[in-house]
């Protein structure tokens, strides 16, 4: 296994200009994470490669998250390089939260959507509950601008939390196209200039039939375009955009990719909520490591799905997601030494090398 770890270290070193000690840690962290499928440090410490005692491994994990100044730009660029997808990108913005004891963990995350899945590129971790602020959202977008440029955004997708005058002005100022969902009772003007709940404009569209209003409406002091459809049971999907779009709901469906990401980071992959970390800075670093681990697993699954035709179940979907397919392969490689396949290992390393 030593030679295999070295090949992983060498590949990481070729893509991340870190010192050797940090690269060695990252390689062992990835292997341990794929083995135990949890971010719980105590569990990771039990399978950390090397001759060190479990207690020493645990302290090493803590020390990395506490002291190492992680170069997030390099990791974000590596994630995008690993995906092999070029911009402009469809982005999905969302928030997830949970509690560690009495402490709130709140993560605002921006992801690139590719093949129906979100891939994390920038995020903010907050120690307080509740919705994100406009300033937090603007900061997140500015981080993306610094990395890739505003021109690399094809469309920004977000749920009902992400609306407001200052926020929309910011997006329009940077010429960012967006599709944001509105609450159905948001007050808008109808054709006669009367203020009515937004859902009334789409009350007669029919079930799951989309209507795009041809003229802009004045909202939050801005000229914005509305579209909507009735979902049944009193629910409406109402979208707001800075310009007329023929089929906005098809674009908005891509927002589901970030929900897929959160599921993979949590219960269907790395069990993020198992962490006992409470400090935002340490959680920030942990998320960066998970971004790389998640993307590598997806790319491995993508390769496997291409060489081995997946049988679809009755509902029309494969039994495993591409991410889970890749995660299972990596898990088997790092845990089942009796059946270790060096050919497969070399292949997954080549995928990580982006060559």
Where do the model's predicted regions map?
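Active-site-proximal, Lys/Arg-enriched surface segment
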Residues: 58-116
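Short, basic interhelical loop/turn and adjoining N-cap
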Residues: 47-60
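Single, function-defining residue in the core of a domain
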Residues: 1-40, 50-52, 74-76, 86-89, ...
């Amino acid at each position: 296994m030593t030679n295999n770890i070295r090949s992983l270290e060498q590949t990481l070193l070729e893509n991340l200009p870190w010192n050797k000690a940090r690269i060695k840690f990252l390689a062992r962290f990835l292997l341990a994470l794929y083995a135990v499928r949890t971010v719980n440090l105590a569990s990771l410490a039990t399978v950390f490669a090397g001759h060190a005692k479990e207690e020493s491994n645990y302290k090493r994990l803590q020390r990395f998250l506490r002291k190492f100044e992680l170069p997030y730009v390099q990791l974000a660029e590596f994630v995008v390089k690993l995906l092999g997808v070029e911009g402009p990108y469809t982005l999905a913005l969302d928030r997830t939260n949970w509690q560690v004891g009495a402490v709130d963990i709140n993560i605002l995350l921006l992801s690139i959507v590719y093949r129906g899945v979100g891939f994390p590129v920038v995020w903010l971790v907050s120690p307080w509950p509740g919705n994100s602020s406009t300033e937090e959202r603007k900061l997140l977008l500015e981080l993306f601008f610094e990395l890739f440029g505003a021109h690399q955004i094809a469309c920004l997708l977000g749920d009902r939390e992400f609306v407001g005058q200052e926020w929309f002005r910011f997006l329009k100022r940077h010429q960012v196209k967006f599709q944001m969902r509105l609450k159905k009772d948001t007050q808008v003007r109808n054709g006669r200039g009367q203020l009515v709940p937004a859902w009334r404009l789409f009350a007669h569209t029919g079930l799951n039939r989309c209507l795009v209003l041809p003229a802009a409406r004045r909202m939050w002091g801005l000229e914005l375009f509305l579209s909507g459809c009735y979902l049944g049971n009193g629910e409406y999907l109402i979208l707001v955009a800075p310009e007329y779009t023929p089929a906005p709901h098809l674009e908005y469906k891509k927002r589901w990719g970030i929900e897929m990401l959160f599921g993979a980071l949590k219960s269907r992959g790395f069990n993020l909520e198992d962490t006992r970390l409470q400090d935002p800075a340490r959680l920030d670093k942990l998320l960066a490591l998970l971004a790389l681990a998640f993307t590598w697993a997806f790319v491995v699954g993508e390769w496997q799905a291409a060489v081995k035709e997946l049988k679809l179940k009755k509902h029309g979907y494969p039994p495993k997601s591409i991410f889970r397919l890749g995660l299972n392969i990596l898990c088997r490689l790092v845990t089942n030494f009796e059946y270790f396949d060096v050919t497969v290992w070399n292949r997954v390393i080549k995928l990580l090398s982006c060559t």
